[in-house]
């Protein structure tokens, strides 16, 4: 998915290792999604149409991703500048479960996972599901003791989102369940994210050629 979306100025970062995860038996060596987003940031700045117009790109990450708190600080002016990407447009993909918990019990726990670890341990990718099927898979991950979890309350995460939006105008909000429930071509694939302005939604598939 990442390779396909890079060609149209959108980065869906879901399958990358979280910061500090293991790679091929080496402990804690993964740099996380922020390092790769910085590459997208520099690419957008470099592609300026002969100095006429700076390139732009949106970066989408799921709200259950372990790096989401750091992702929300991408464009803020405080903190480590090595972890910033001021020229990209962050966006978050939400399931309906998140907003339902925010409405019914905002102090509920929200569990963050490493997508690569989920795939290795559980044998599936959370981002490949939506709606009730996604909620079922998410709850299986919560119950799985072999998965490392980062736990925030829904309230704390909403506060981080609002703080970022007040300071930077981002992240954009993409409700993936709603998009896929309304998808007239759901028999042909799944919608993972959107475009720079969050108004175009198309089926996305891996490039197999």
List the model feature ranges, each with a label.
Residues 1-209:
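Active-site cavity-forming subdomains of large catalytic enzyme subunits
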């Amino acid at each position: 998915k990442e390779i396909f979306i890079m060609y149209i100025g959108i980065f869906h970062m879901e399958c990358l290792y979280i910061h500090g995860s293991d790679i091929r038996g080496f402990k804690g060596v993964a740099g996380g999604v922020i390092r790769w987003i910085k590459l997208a940031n520099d690419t957008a700045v470099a592609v300026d149409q002969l100095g006429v117009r700076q390139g732009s790109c949106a970066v989408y990450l799921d709200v259950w991703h372990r790096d989401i708190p750091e992702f929300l600080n991408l464009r803020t002016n405080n903190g480590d500048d090595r972890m910033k990407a001021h020229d990209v447009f962050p966006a978050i993909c939400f399931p309906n479960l998140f907003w339902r918990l925010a409405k019914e019990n905002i102090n509920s726990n929200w569990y963050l996972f490493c997508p690569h670890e989920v795939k290795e341990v559980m044998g599936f990718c959370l981002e490949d599901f939506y709606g009730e099927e996604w909620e079922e898979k998410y709850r299986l991950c919560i119950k799985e003791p072999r998965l490392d979890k980062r736990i925030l309350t829904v309230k704390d995460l909403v506060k981080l989102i609002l703080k970022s939006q007040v300071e930077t105008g981002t992240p954009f909000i993409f409700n993936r369940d709603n998009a896929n429930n309304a998808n007239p071509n759901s028999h042909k694939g799944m919608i993972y994210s959107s475009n720079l302005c969050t108004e175009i939604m198309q089926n996305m598939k891996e490039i197999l050629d």
